[in-house]
Amino acid sequence: MLTIHRKYSGVAKEPVLYVADNGTHQELKGAKARAWLDKICATGKQSRILSTSACSIDDMLLALAERGVQIFTAHWHSVGVDKKLEPGEIAEAFSKVADSALRPYIARTDLAALRGRVITRNAVIEYRKSVANSLRNVGLRTGVSADRYPKWLKEEIEALRTDGKPVEYDLDKQVKAEAEKIPECVTFRRIFGMKDVSIVEAQFVSCVGDTSRFPTVGSLWHYCGQHVTDDGKAPHRKRGAANDWNPEARTVLWNTIDTGLKANNPVIRPLYEYYKAKELETHDAGNAETGKKPCKCETKQGHCGARARRRVTKELLKQYYVATGGTGQQRTVLQSTICRLESMRRVSKAA
């Protein structure tokens, strides 16, 4: 089947298409790539292509799907293609995949619209911060403190706010209204124990997309930066190296867990205490059943707390993956765990 594999090159991240068919491939970029895509769009429903990307909010795939092009995807785990191959070799390998391993591409225009609003909001915030800092630097360079700013400088800084609120306030309302309509956002808020609509679920869902593209929960963990590298450590960004995980998703999750702990979130806090207690038990002695080795680090509380945070994140992500995967389970393992912890807490108080 005609296969598309895309990579980005250069500082400008120009998209490069590797198109394969019958075991041979060609590299297209710039005007040639656009002309080839226009040709595929013109044929419409007569075209059938296989994409190595299954992202439901991919602009290129959404445009092709809108024109009626039949798009299929295949999980990397099911086809057994090594991700370390050259781009052209990856496209050739996917073009030979059996039809039984293919699955229809799911286009999510609602998530794409949400993603656009989130990106716009983030850009406005960065612009406001940049301009405000530049104006404040005027006072720093002239040696004037904030309480002695001249009137014109105060007016310029205040102009970045509307009705006493940041300029992104209206965008926040639009993002929240959009998130209310998307089932994944509602599910995220419920599983993470969040009462009110916030920007958090919109940020996470808009960068993760439809979870059906992940064959296992481990794939979702990996995409969100919750996996362990070959050297046994958490993943980190490296200069000049491409990431196979999403830094934005990991940042959103870390902030969500951190805020939940500070606010005594009814879901996050009990789970954290439960996992931290288990980590403290096995920190010095290890665990023969799981093969965990004893740890003799000097920062026992901090180490166990960090491991507990990671376990909470992975557990909640697992529940989110199950809930959005169409299983229809109402009473999850997480809910049972929370009920058991609450019962234990009531018993301990009574004693």
Language model features with spans:
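Phosphate-backbone recognition surface of nucleic-acid-processing proteins
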Residues: R190, F204-G305
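Phosphate- and other anionic-substrate recognition elements at nucleic-acid/protein interfaces
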Residues: M1-P150, A351
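Low-complexity, acidic/Ser/Thr- and charged residue-rich accessory regions of DNA metabolism proteins
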Residues: L271-A351
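Short helix-capping/linker segments at secondary-structure and domain boundaries
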Residues: V97-L102, D210-R213, D258-V267, Y321-T332
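Hydrophobic, well-ordered secondary-structure scaffolds
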Residues: Y8-V16, A20-E27, K181-I191, I199-T211
